Amino acid sequence: MSKIESLSERAELRFWGWGYADEHLSAQEDQLVEAMVSVMAPNNTEIAPPSIDDFDLPPPRLELPEVLTAFVSTTKYDRLVHSYGKSYPDIVRMFLHQIDNPPDWVAFPKTEQQISELLAYASKNNIAVIPFGGGTSVCGGVESDIGKDYQASVSLDLEYFNLSLIHI
């Protein structure tokens, strides 16, 4: 498996479902996926785990400003991982290649200052910011369906904010 292009340092996640990219589905999981997708797929659509190359995402709606390039990604992999959560409909839409609203950018800040810079830029430029924790949302909370109220969307991945600090 070739190394994907990402600003994330975590093990490569499956962009289309639960788990890591180097893990294979069991026979039972394969059957479950086929059953899930067949409910929503028209005309017995062939079921196969999607590949990054299967997707043609629209370009980001705004150009990434220089001030954010150190920690904000526009790679296809990062945008796919952050397009949906891991609910049944999310996984089925990935298998059917239905990515209607991928985030324009994906931020991986490592400092509070970077979060502040991102939020200030987003506020000033009418960009929706969508928090992303571990990527296990099953209620649509990470989806970038922002309508026409915003110019663009950024998924704010909190991967590097994994410590609880208590100030006494």
Regions found by a protein language model. Give the residues of each.
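Noncatalytic alpha-helical scaffold of FAD-dependent oxidoreductases
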Residues: 1-166
